[in-house]
Amino acid sequence: MSDNEHTTVRIVDIARMAGVSVATVDRVIHNRGKVSEENLARINEVLHEVNYRPNLIARSLASGRQYTLAVVMPRFAQGEYWADFDAGIVRAEAEARRYNVTIRKFFFDQYDRSSFEKLLATLRGETFDGAVLATLFAEMVSPFTRELDERGVPYVFVDSNLPGCNQLAYFGTSSFDAGAVAARLLYDRLDPGSDIVVGRIIHRGDAGSNQCRSREEGFRSYLQQQGFRGKLHYAALRLDDEAYNREVLDDLLLKHRAIAGAVTFNSTCYILAGYLAARRRTDVRLVGYDVIRRNGQMLDEGVVTALVAQRPEAQGYRGVMALCEWLVEGRRPDTAENNMPIDILLKENIRYYKNNLI
């Protein structure tokens, strides 16, 4: 029987196929009342044949059971990476209502470790049935998940995966491989002996996110495999201090004349791009991550060589829906590690990119 037939099979159809009454099928499906062993065997055989699954969504609505999901994510402004992720949450929220599921969002400052510590303290006093966790601060997320395990609260990871945890699923790219992709995009455009600038946003209390560290590991690994003979130079930059960033980069590029490439491992490559455009440094190739508005504009203008994208809206949407299906239907995702495609965007194809594809 086809998948479409599976979804439309009715109790009356099962009764007809098993040669029993509708009432008998109802007693078996809902586990109420006695049924002869012969009829039970017939009905179970048909249920297996048609791959029947009871309508647990309708049952949940009828029972009045309410579920709450906690979505833990960085605070954002419109046009930033996490705004796209939030669009996926909003989209899933509309569908989650049919499961009697409501969503509560909890925000932290992704550039401030103490902000996440305070949020975890808040979450310990909250009651929720499942959680979507952005894993930027891996060293704090892992211990917190053990607390969720003890409470019997299922959770999914987004942004980057963490080993040694009991997550229901992960939705995101392979950060290591995404780093290798960026390295290839840059290395193929450089002489093997050229130097590379790595732009890093200054964090308060932490060296950077788990995802950025994994991307850098993949980046370095690829360069090493290719026999890269240049050097990596790190530029500690600030989010909203153009004068400071200009001074840092002027000094770095003046001291290291072999610099011909640049990369950032988060969504802020527009900072480096703005500097290169202002200084007319067309000799420096820049690769970054995420199709946010400012990055896309710099790519379209030819300042950015390439962007690596990871479909944040799909991550948010699928994370919420996986928890809904598990809580209400008892259905796990087909795979625990759900890697998004690693999309490569160039000036020639960015106008056709649909970042919101689920």
Predicted features and spans:
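N-terminal helix-turn-helix DNA-binding module of bacterial transcription factors
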Residues: 1-64
